[in-house]
Amino acid sequence: MKVVIVGNGPGGFELAKQLSQTYEVTVIDKEPVPYYSKPMLSHYIAGFIPRNRLFPYSLDWYRKRGIEIRLAEEAKLIDRGRKVVITEKGEVPYDTLVLATGARAREPQIKGKEYLLTLRTIFDADRIKESIENSGEAIIIGGGFIGLELAGNLAEAGYHVKLIHRGAMFLGLDEELSNMIKDMLEETGVKFFLNSELLEANEEGVLTNSGFIEGKVKICAIGIVPNVDLARRSGIHTGRGILIDDNFRTSAKDVYAIGDCAEYSGIIAGTAKAAMEQARVLADILKGEPRRYNFKFRSTVFKFGKLQIAIIGNTKGEGKWIEDNTKVFYENGKIIGAVVFNDIRKATKLEKEILDFYS
């Protein structure tokens, strides 16, 4: 069976790796470089790791695994009748097609948005790194995973960092946990502007409802927009993302979708960890070993500055501190969620316990 994967990000790469010993695999990606670690981009920008450390696998690795890798090649259309992906360089036939096209950065619809940088690719990271090294400072707009991680790492590296967030709380967490994150980042040197709405940008800074904030380098991290254009052009059903069922099947026969481009019952993965787990589950399905992915369960770990935090399961409602660094959330006497600071071993143990609730 010939499996074609469009996209070489965390989900697409992991799927290719999982299937390469079983099927003939081709990966198509519009970027000109092999797989790199997107979660480590902010660490590279801050100067904590060199650029080459972002690339764990060489092109030779793909060849040794028997994976055909077609880089700098954009998929333009899917001919579902002939089962062919049409690219700018030719046609690629498939038996099974997997769309792992990821997402792009959401841009605010404001005057002066051309003065804002975004972070999704290694080339975005290169531009940001060069800009901040020249200026020594950055304004970050957005208090999600990317914004907080970048702010913490840049501040830890000695840059002057201002973070603008339209709300007062972060990552869907409660006020107590949000304040802890804020306090820890403030100790690192991040200056916060909360409940601040971005209105306009120019070369000298940004205008918010709280006033004008000066800064030459402005990085916007206010969310993602799933890349659905290929699917939509090809007549595959889309909403915010490419619509899939609980086996990752799209509305087109023998076409699947995973990662940030895929939408299941209103849910979009949003993290590299989720995309990679979806890839592992889909690989088993395609090998004839059916397995279920729990779309409602979230688990992510990220690091900004000296702070490492794991967010697991449902963290809504009233939680209880069981240790200084661990807050858990219960339902009917069972743990349904947890937030763990600076202890990945404990987070892994709790994740297994919480997964039992969801299974």
Swiss-Prot record:
Q: Does the keyword RNA-binding apply?
A: no
Give one GO term, molecular function aspect: nucleotide binding
What cofactor does this one take? FAD
pH dependence of function: Optimum pH is 7.0 for the reduction of rubredoxin.
Which positions does UniProt annotate for FAD binding? G11, D29, K30, K38, P39, A75, A103, R120, D260
Q: Which reaction does it catalyse?
A: 2 reduced [rubredoxin] + NADP(+) + H(+) = 2 oxidized [rubredoxin] + NADPH; 2 reduced [rubredoxin] + NAD(+) + H(+) = 2 oxidized [rubredoxin] + NADH
What SUPFAM superfamilies does this protein map onto?
FAD/NAD(P)-binding domain, FAD/NAD-linked reductases, dimerisation (C-terminal) domain
Where does the source fall among the domains of life?
Archaea
The question of whether Lyase is a record keyword is answered with no
Bound cofactor: record note: Binds 1 FAD per subunit.
Do you know which Pfam families this protein is assigned to? PF1197-like_C, Pyr_redox_2
How temperature affects activity?
A: Thermostable.
UniProt enzyme class: oxidoreductase
Q: Where is it localised?
A: Cytoplasm
Keyword line: Cytoplasm, Electron transport, FAD, Flavoprotein, NAD, NADP, Nucleotide-binding, Oxidoreductase, Stress response, Transport
Q: Name one GO cellular component term.
A: cytoplasm
Q: What is its EC number?
A: 1.18.1.4
Report the protein's function.
Catalyzes the NADH-dependent reduction of rubredoxin (Rd), a small iron-containing redox protein. Can also reduce other electron carriers, including 2,6-dichlorophenol indophenol, benzyl viologen and menadione, but rubredoxin is the most efficient electron acceptor. Does not reduce ferredoxin. Shows comparable activity with NADPH and NADH as electron donors, but NADPH is probably the preferred physiological electron donor. Is probably part of an oxygen detoxification system that protects P.furiosus during exposure to oxygen.
Protein family according to the UniProt entry? Belongs to the FAD-dependent oxidoreductase family.
Q: What else does the entry mention about this protein?
A: NROR, unlike the vast majority of enzymes from hyperthermophilic sources, shows considerable activity at low temperatures.
Q: How does it assemble?
A: Monomer.
The molecule here is called: NAD(P)H:rubredoxin oxidoreductase
| The organism of origin for this protein | Pyrococcus furiosus (strain ATCC 43587 / DSM 3638 / JCM 8422 / Vc1)
